[in-house]
Amino acid sequence: MKKLLLSILIFNTFVTHIIAQENKEKIELEEIEILSSPRIQIESSQNSISVLTISQEQINNSTATNISELLQQIAGLDVRRRGIEGMQADLYIRGGSFDQTLLLIDGIKVEDPQTGHHTMNMTLPLEVIEKIEIVKGAASRMYGQNAFTGAINIITKKDIENNISFGLAGGSFDQKRGNITIQKEYENSNILVNYNRKESEGYRYNTDFKNDELFLKSNFKIKNQKITGIAAFNDRKFGANGFYASPEAIDQYEETQASIVGFSTIYENNNILIKPKLYWKRNQDMYVYLRQDPSVYRNLHISNKVGIEVNALLNNKFGMLGLGIDISNTTLSSNNLGQRDRKMLHVFAEQQMKFFDSKLDLTPGIAITYFSDLANSTDPNSTENSDGWTNVPHIYPGIDLGYNFNEKFKLYSNIGYTFRIPTYTDQFYTSPTTVGNEFLVYEKALTSELGIKYKKENFNLTFSAYNRAASDVIDYVKNEESEPWRANNIREITTLGFEFNMGYKFYLGSFNTHQINIGFSNINDDLKETEFNFSRYALNSLKNQITSTYSFELNSKISSTIAFKNARRLNEEKYTVLDFKTSYKYEKFTLSIILNNILDTEYTETNLVPMPGFNSLIGIKYSIN
C-alpha cells in the first residue's frame, strides 16, 4: 500500500511539474491513440475479425453502474458475478474460462499470474471511460497469452476539458456512493482525476463491501514529444459468503488491491508510426476462510509486473505491416504458491494486403512468445519431471480474409492458433482438497470464424459463426472420492457457436433520440470424456443468451433506458432480468433512478451464489465548467 501511494505521489508530482511549465504559445494536444490494439488500425466495420465497440453514449445511457454490469449487456460475453457492484466477477468470452480472457486498459495488459479470478479487479469507473473495444476469437496472435477466447480493451477519456463533477447515490442494501471528477486544461497539458467510494451492508449475510477507486490521467509534453500517463488504484474489502469453496462456506472474506501506472507516446516519421509504452501493474489478494478467525486459514498473494511494449506500423507497397514486441518481468510472493519469477518475450508481425480495388483484404500474421519458467512436454499428463521437458517458444500463426461487396457490406473469415499458460494457482496451489501440478503445459486451440458485417448510417448488423477446437485444457480430476483434486491437462473441448448483433438509432422530432441494440448468442460444447472417474470441470457456459437495450428521450430533459437479459446455462433453467433507468437534467444537475431486477427473478450466475432480487438506486450529479 505504501509503495503504491508513493508511486502515485511521484506520478502526480511529476505531472504537476510538467503542467506548471508555461509556454508562451499555447499548444493544442493531438489525440494520442495509445491502444486500441497493437495491430493495424482500421475501422472496426472493416476489420476481418469480430470487433464490437461500446461507445461513450451507450455507457452514459446504460442502466449499469460498473463495468461488470455493462459487459453483461453484450451477447457473447458472460460476466458471472458473486454479489453486487462487481466486487467479485469473472469474465468469459464465447464459452471459454475466466483464465482465457484478457483485459487491457489503454492497451496495457492487466492479466494476473495468480488466477483469472482477479482479472476484473483492475476495472475503472464508468466516468473515466471513452469507449470499450471487444475482440472475440483467437486474439493471442495480437495480444499474447490469456487472449485465448478474446480480449477487452478499456479506453480512457481523451478529450479532457475544464470541468468538475460531483455525484452522490444511495439505495437498497444500505448502499452509499460518492464520486468526484476533476478535469483541468493547462497551456501545454491537461489532467483528469477521479475518486470513487462505494459501500454497502450487503444483500444477505456476509456480503457487505467497501470499495475505493482512484484514477489519474494526464497528457503533457517533454521536449515537444507528447506523452500520456495513467495511474489507477482499486481497493476492495468484501464478505464472500459462498463465493469460493462451497455454498456452505458462509464466513469467507477477501481484500484485494489492484494498481497500474503506465506511460505511452507516438513517434511518426513519413510512413512509419511507432507506439511505445512502459507500465507497472500490481495485485494484492488476502483471503481468509473464517472472517471471525483468520488464523484458521489465510492466504496472502502479491504480484508485480513491469513491462515495456513497442508496436510499429509501416506503409509499404503491399499495404501495411504491423510489428510488435512486448517484454515483461512478473513476480509473485505468496504464502501458499511460493516465490515466483517469470520473464516473458512476445513478438508478432502481420501484413495487411489489399486486392481488386481494395475489395479483398488478406492479413497473415504470426506471433512467438517465450516464458522463462514454463516448459513443453511430450507427456502433458506427467506429474514428474523428465527428459521430455523443453523450454521452447510458443509459435502461433493466423490469417484474416475479408471481401467488401460495397462500403456497407463485408464478408469476413479468419483462422488462427491461440494459447493460455497455466496460472500459478493451477501449478502450485495446495490445500487438503486441491493439489496443483507444476508440470502443466499450456492450453491451445485452433479457432476459425465466418461472419458478415453491414453498416448503413444509423443501422449496423453483424453475424458470425465460429468453431474452437481446444486441447490440453486444464481440469481437476481424481479416481477415488477420498483423493484430493489434482490439476492435469486432460480435456479436449470443441465449441461451436454463432452470434447476432444489431443496432439502430433513429429520431422522433427534433431532439428525441431512440436507440435499440439487440444481441443473441448460442453455444454448443462437445466435451471429450476422460479416463478419470471424477472430474471437477463442469461446462456451465451460456447455452443461449439474448440481450437488448432500448434508450429513448422523452424530451430535452428526460431520458430513459430499458435493459433486457435472457439466459440459459447448460443443465439449468433459463432466467430473465429486466433493469430500468431514467434521468432528469435541470441546468447543472442530473437526477437518476435505477431499478434493477424489476421482475424480482431468482437466479444465480456462478457457484450457487444467489443474486439479489428487486433493488433500486437513486443518485444526483452536479457538473460545472
Name what the model sees in each region.
Residues N315-L321, F356-D357, L362, N467-A469, ...:
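Gram-negative outer-membrane beta-barrel transporters
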Residues A245-E268, D387-D400, N404, K410, ...:
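Outer-membrane beta-barrel signature, preferentially recognizing the C-terminal barrel domain
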